[in-house]
């Protein structure tokens, strides 16, 4: 059985296993559904965010604290937490998950994302929010769904970096991420 997230489906092996035309038709429909699920997951990563308890606690502290620090070990989800929270606030509305106890924004937001250098912001934060920098096919594979990205503007002098992202907020307005 192939992993649902594997990029390849061995169609020949599946067709060989199908003994009748009806079996093949059922299998072809299932393959098409798997492709649709993959496409939805690829461009809606925010829906797949399943935070650890420390991340839930971090997001919840936003109700009382305007400034927070998430300090944790390497590869534990700090970037994912920040990207998710930034995306959720930029999107608003029903993008706030049921477990969310932090601050909610009914109107579009303005957010600033920073890092050690423009290159590190591009390679880490921008990728987490938008998808792989410089790959047009990857636009929308980060935490902000493709269909909600209104426009991005390039940052002069830094290849594949953006200076601003405009996101359609649930209220109908535009959120800005700098």
Protein language model regions, located:
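Phosphate/NTP-binding elements of NTP-utilizing enzymes
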Residues: 1-178
